[in-house]
């Protein structure tokens, strides 16, 4: 192998390594954004302390599913499978935050039921996530929705 061939090989490997590292940083940055709490810092501890008063029974999860697919129209944005790409979502046209992917293990682990309830009660400014508790569902129905959303996550 000539000196020139060695230099080309080294440069090629450096480019591949550089692209790999850049991609890793982009993925890591995306993960941090996914895990960023949507509850304001001055309310986060209070929200995290709130527990779902309903047990995760098959009947209540099924009620949450009926709400998700019906009255609360969650599937429109979050999709039937909870992956955040509902029928009204075109990722190429969305500016800013895409609808939450409820199947992400890290997100399921990081967010508490109380934080999810806070979002349902307050919406998320700057996104399409509106206030749902009150205008669309009752608080009890919101807890049922949360039980169903948890069913998209990995089994404990």
Predicted regions and their residues:
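Protein kinase-like catalytic domain
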Residues: 78, 150-153
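Extracytoplasmic electron-transfer domains, predominantly the class I c-type cytochrome c fold
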Residues: 93-133, 137-149
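Sequence/structural segment immediately N-terminal to covalent heme-attachment motifs in c-type
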Residues: 58-80, 88-91
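Bacterial N-terminal signal peptides that target proteins for export
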Residues: 2-12
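Sec/Tat signal peptide C-region and signal peptidase I cleavage site
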Residues: 23-28
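Cleaved targeting-peptide boundary
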Residues: 29-36
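Electrostatic cytochrome c docking/interface patches
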Residues: 36-69, 156
């Amino acid at each position: 192998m000539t000196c020139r061939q060695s230099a080309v090989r080294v440069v090629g490997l450096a480019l591949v390594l550089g692209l790999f590292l850049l991609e890793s940083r982009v993925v890591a940055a995306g993960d941090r954004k996914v895990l960023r709490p949507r509850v304001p810092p001055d309310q986060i501890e209070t929200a995290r302390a709130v527990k779902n008063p309903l047990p995760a029974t098959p009947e209540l999860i099924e009620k949450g599913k009926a709400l998700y697919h019906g009255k609360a129209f969650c599937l429109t944005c979050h999709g039937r499978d909870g992956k955040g790409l509902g029928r009204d979502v075109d990722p190429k046209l969305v500016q800013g935050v895409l609808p939450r992917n409820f199947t992400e293990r890290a997100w399921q682990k990081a967010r508490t039921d109380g934080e999810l309830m806070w979002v349902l009660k307050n919406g998320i400014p700057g996104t399409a996530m509106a206030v749902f508790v009150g205008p669309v569902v009752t608080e009890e129905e919101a807890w049922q929705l949360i039980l169903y959303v948890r069913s998209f996550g990995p089994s404990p």
